[in-house]
Design a protein with these regions (language model features):
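Sequence signature of WD/YWTD-type beta-propeller architectures
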Residues: 1-148
Length: 148
């Protein structure tokens, strides 16, 4: 199944994840669906790819049990690097200037079996300067507003 499509800023290409080879990997295709090629090369399963606003990177979630990672790579799959690692990380979204990622982190379940707290964070794409975005309650699925 092909899921989680994200258009390039010029709308000429899409990146998506697919289990077409057994494990979830990232693929790029022309906007019309032609010329599909796999770009992820490392181990683990890849999810939720998002094209950067400048079109130079793709952010993604990666799972190598038991941990989740948020990383970035060049649009051809080269130079994959991990930005942050934890128990559960989801929903990376680019800042309008392409220098930061916002995402949410879920803590491990509480001892009574209830889900752990979820918090929204942002971090620069080098993996430094991580900060929590204060929210009145748990937060998930963050998004940036566009530059005006």
């Amino acid at each position: 199944i092909d899921v989680s499509a994200s258009f390039s800023p010029d709308a000429k290409k899409i990146v998506f994840n697919s289990d077409r080879n057994g494990r979830r990997h990232l693929y790029i295709a022309e906007a019309d669906g032609k010329n599909v090629r796999r770009i992820s090369r490392e181990g683990g399963s890849y999810y939720t790819p998002v094209w950067s606003p400048r079109g130079d990177y793709i952010a993604f979630v990666k799972n190598i049990r038991p941990d989740f990672y948020i990383g970035v790579m060049d649009t051809n799959g080269d130079n994959e690097r991990i930005v942050v690692k934890d128990f559960s990380l989801e929903s990376p979204a680019w800042s309008p200037n392409g220098r930061y990622l916002i995402f949410y982190r879920q803590q491990r379940s509480n001892s009574d079996g209830t889900g752990g707290e979820t918090t929204i964070h942002f971090i620069d794409i080098t993996g430094y300067n991580e900060r929590i975005i204060p929210t009145p309650r748990d937060g998930s699925d963050p998004a940036w507003s566009p530059l005006l």
